[in-house]
Amino acid sequence: RSKDAPDAVIVATGSETLVLPFIKGITAPEIVHGGDCLSGKRPVGHKVLVVGGGMVGAETAEFLAEKGHDVSIIEMRDAIGPDVIHEHRVFLMEGLKEYDVHQYVDAAVSEIYPDGVSYKNAADKSDDTVYELRGFDTVVLSMGYVSKYTHREGQEVVYDFVDELKAICPEVHVVGDAIRARRALDATKEAYDVALNI
C-alpha cells in the first residue's frame, strides 16, 4: 500500500438516467432526460409525454403539468407511482388528477420517437398489438436512475470503480444514489452515518 493511499474513501458519485438499449430510439438527441428537464437545462414544448411512471416520472409529470404543460405519462407497471411512499403518493396522485395528466399503465414501450412512443400491452403477453402515442412536442425519459460509479452495457455491470478502490484502500463506503437512486433524505442520512463511523 502506498503512503499516499487514503485511509478511507466515500463514494458519493450519484446516479444518472437509466437508458435501456433494447428500446429503439431511446438515445435520439431529441429525447429529453428528466433531470435535464427539471433543471431547465433542456426546454420542453407544450404537449409532453413522460416515459416512466415511477417516483421520478410521476413527479416530473406533476411538475410540468403545474407549469401549464399538457402532460401524459406512460408506465409499464399497472399503476403510476407504485414506488412512492404512501403518504406522498396520495398527494402526488391528487396533483396528477388536478392537472389532468393523462395516464397510460400496463404499457411496455418498445420504441421512442421524437413525438411519442410505440408500446405493447404489458398485462397481456399474448396481445401482440403494437399501440402508438404520437403527436407530442417533447418526450421526456424518466424510467429511473442507475449508479454513476459503474459502467453498464444495458442492465449488465461491466466495470465497477469500487473494486479498483478496494485494491488501494482498506475502507471503501458507497453511499446515496451511488448505491441506488432514492429520496435525498435517505441518501443524506446514510452519508451522515458513514461519516460518523470513519
Residues of each region from the PLM?
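A conserved FAD-binding loop/helix module that cradles the flavin
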Residues: 57-60, 79-89, 149-160, 165-167, ...
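A Rossmann-like FAD-binding core segment of flavoenzymes
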Residues: 1-47, 66-161, 168
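Glycine-rich adenosine-cofactor-binding loop
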Residues: 49-65
